[in-house]
């Protein structure tokens, strides 16, 4: 195919005719593609050569390994601003009600004493949280989150300074806070299950009658009756326990 293309090209340009060309084995140069390509190709390039790739990771960082910019960059005629010294700056008064103080104790110290870490109450029970509203549970949850953040901050500072005290009290306090969080999750899970079951009943076509609704409201509103016998037994048990104490 290459020999045919060269021969046809010479014939079209008015060169040697097909009859005047010698055979290929006598003049192989006439039939080679390199001769035709080299005659048309220039020996130099007019396009600018691309810039060499700079493989230095320290260009512009180190004074020894830097190579400088590859192209001229604009420079502003205005000087760079200089930072003011701390002595010239006005001291702002500390805000005692700032939200970041919640990461510290009441005395606003990074590491509380073991007595302060141990001075806490018990965890909220599930029975107590069932009586709370959605807003109360929401507020209580974020109170526990802030308390755990405060405990984590004190643990970090205690470990950084190698204080050597307060780890046991902080762990007990964190366990109490986590118990409250588990109780909140349990109550919310119960309410979600109740809502899901009510939704399935409603979608299934169940509609409570007005009498059933009134009975449920009266049962929840009225307190449970206590028999006199139960009161007598409770008073007797209290007197016996007081005597034992």
Curated annotation (Swiss-Prot):
Main location as per UniProt: mitochondrion
GO MF assignments: structural constituent of ribosome
Origin: domain of life: Eukaryota
Membrane-spanning residues: none
Signal sequence bounds: none
GO cellular component, one term: mitochondrial large ribosomal subunit
Family statement: Belongs to the universal ribosomal protein uL29 family.
UniProt entry tagged with the keyword Manganese: no
Gene Ontology biological process terms in this record: mitochondrial translation
Record keywords: Mitochondrion, Ribonucleoprotein, Ribosomal protein, Transit peptide
Name the record gives this protein: Large ribosomal subunit protein uL29m
Region ranges (Disordered): 36-98, 207-245
Compartments (UniProt record): Mitochondrion
Composition bias type Low complexity, residue spans: 36-49, 234-245
Subunit structure: Component of the mitochondrial large ribosomal subunit. Mature mitochondrial ribosomes consist of a small (37S) and a large (54S) subunit. The 37S subunit contains at least 33 different proteins and 1 molecule of RNA (15S). The 54S subunit contains at least 45 different proteins and 1 molecule of RNA (21S).
């Amino acid at each position: 195919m290459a020999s045919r293309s060269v021969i046809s090209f010479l014939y079209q340009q008015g060169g040697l005719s097909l009859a005047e060309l010698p055979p290929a084995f006598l003049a192989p140069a006439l039939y080679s593609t390199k001769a035709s390509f080299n005659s048309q190709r220039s020996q130099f390039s007019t396009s600018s050569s691309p810039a060499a790739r700079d493989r230095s990771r320290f260009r512009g960082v180190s004074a020894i390994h830097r190579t400088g910019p590859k192209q001229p960059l604009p420079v502003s005629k205005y000087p760079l601003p200089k930072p003011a010294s701390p002595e010239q700056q006005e001291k702002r008064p500390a805000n005692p009600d700032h939200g970041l103080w919640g990461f510290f104790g009441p005395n606003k110290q990074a590491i509380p004493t073991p007595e302060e870490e141990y001075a806490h109450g018990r965890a909220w029970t599930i029975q107590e949280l069932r009586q709370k509203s959605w807003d109360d549970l929401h507020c209580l949850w974020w109170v526990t989150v802030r308390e755990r953040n405060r405990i984590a901050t004190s643990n970090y500072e205690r470990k950084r300074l190698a204080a050597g005290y307060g780890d046991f009290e902080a762990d007990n306090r964190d366990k109490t806070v986590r118990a409250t969080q588990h109780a909140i999750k349990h109550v919310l899970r119960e309410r979600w299950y109740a809502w899901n079951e009510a939704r399935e009943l409603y979608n299934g076509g169940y509609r409570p009658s007005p009498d059933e609704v009134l009975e449920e409201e009266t049962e929840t509103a009225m307190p449970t009756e206590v028999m006199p016998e139960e009161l007598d037994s409770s008073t007797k048990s209290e007197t016996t326990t007081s005597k034992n104490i």
